[in-house]
Amino acid sequence: MGSMMAFAFSEIGLDVSIWDVKYDNVQQLLESAKNTNYKGKIEGFKDVSKFTQSLEGKAERKIFLFSITHGDPADSVLDMIKKDLKKGDIILDGGNENYRRTEARQKICEKIGVSWIGLGVSGGYQSARRGPSLSPGGDKEALDLVMPLLELYAGKDAKSGQPCVTRIGPKGSGHFVKMVHNGIEGGMLSTLAEAWSLLHYGRGMGYEEIADLFESWNKEGVLRNNYLLEIGAELLRVKKTPQGDGNGEGVGDGGFVLDDVLDKVVQDDDNTEGTPYWSVMESASRHISAPTLATAHFMRIASGNRIERLEVAKQLRIPSPSPIRGMKDIEAFKEHLHSAVYSSFLASFCQGLELIARASEDEGWDIDLGKCLQIWRSGCIIRSEGIADILQPAVSGNKGIKNMKYIDTVAQELHRTYPSLKEIVMAATDSDHYIPAISATLEYLKYEGGTNLPTKFMEAQMDFFGAHGYNLPGVPGEDPGPVSKGPHHYEWRPAK
């Protein structure tokens, strides 16, 4: 990511100094930059002090861009360069950092007159080179100074030409929005993986046939211009060759590269990726129901520890997924699956945006959800034009909408796709397929729109053992009433 950013800024015309804890990484970047015609100069450094001094005198302020693993590594680098920082310098932290840690660094830097901006960067290393989606958050003066540069660098919305970057808000808001972006991404990734599995293992479709289907979904309709469908179709077509990719992978005389990929997602288990986990924790702590995002994350966790999973499989002896027995009409199945995937994608967006809205209110950030959707229109993993076209007009301009299901068009779409969602869940469950995100979306719609939940019984039991209190149905001020403890308690079993 850091290398791609360096190339991109040099191409814009900036002189770029680079440094890394591992000097080998610097040398690799410099080697890659040879014989290029970038407008700006790229200079590498082994010594961190010489690196920081190389920027002196070139501008009134030094601008640093971090592309560093979250947590202690970024703190360590800040400690290394702090003595060379001067009042007015700006640090852009482009890592996937926890927003609270960002705010802690902002306080440290504020004392020495330095601005620390939490810069969410989305789109993977390809977009980092050609134009990512950016979500900067921090003090307004520093943001105003760097925005012209970020607007040059950011991806551009194909429809409007607007750069996919905006001032998110103060403090850690930029990294919070990027965290939620990654949470939405997790829900969508799981949904599409589940759909692929249903098509391949459930309906016996080949990879290229599924690629054709994904391409058709991406071409038009509610799932149009969706990044994950785009790359999903692309990777499904990649076959092994005698040469492979030139780096030792994908070597073979036939078959698909996808068959070389084990079912292990380890970025969560080994702590190299924290944003999906933080999204789940934030949704729980801020009382936002986000089951599609959460259960997608939990399947990733289970996938990572394959050793343990294989042992559990021996103990549970649960049937493996089998060909789908229901819905014999394959075209009807595809239509239902299209609607179910769309519903789960849309629910992922609803859950993420509701989390941002709640955090913005809690923290006083004044985030415009419409601008979040605007910067997600290009350069990022959750790009989905059809969904953005539904949501963005309804939430732009801080209209105070905190529950996305209040939006008429959103409610209509979730209502319309509900029967297909149910059909897919029933067919998949009957044939023992893995559908955590899709099934969680179905339950989400059921209980989010439920008028008589089984929690009535739960509330009574909690009152029984803990005197938690309850509200009375049909009583003004209690039904529906505020989210607060009920005034009634019944002595179900008097203490003796």
From Swiss-Prot:
- Amino-acid positions noted as binding substrate in the UniProt annotation, renumbered to this chain: N96, S122, G123, G124, H181, N182, R300, H468
Protein species of origin: Emericella nidulans (strain FGSC A4 / ATCC 38163 / CBS 112.46 / NRRL 194 / M139)
Pathway assigned to this chain's UniProt record: Carbohydrate degradation; pentose phosphate pathway; D-ribulose 5-phosphate from D-glucose 6-phosphate (oxidative stage): step 3/3
Q: What does this protein do?
A: Catalyzes the oxidative decarboxylation of 6-phosphogluconate to ribulose 5-phosphate and CO(2), with concomitant reduction of NADP to NADPH.
- What lineage does the source organism belong to? Eukaryota, Fungi, Dikarya, Ascomycota, Pezizomycotina
Q: Name one GO biological process term.
A: D-gluconate metabolic process
Q: Name one GO cellular component term.
A: cytosol
What catalytic reaction does the record list? Answer: 6-phospho-D-gluconate + NADP(+) = D-ribulose 5-phosphate + CO2 + NADPH
Q: What is this protein called?
A: 6-phosphogluconate dehydrogenase, decarboxylating
Task: Provide the family line.
Answer: Belongs to the 6-phosphogluconate dehydrogenase family.
Q: What class of enzyme is it?
A: oxidoreductase
What residues does NADP(+) bind to?
G13, L14, D15, V16, S17, I18, D24, N25, V26, I68, T69, H70, N96
Q: Which SMART domains match?
A: 6PGD (SM01350)
Annotated catalytic residues: K178 (proton acceptor), E185 (proton donor)
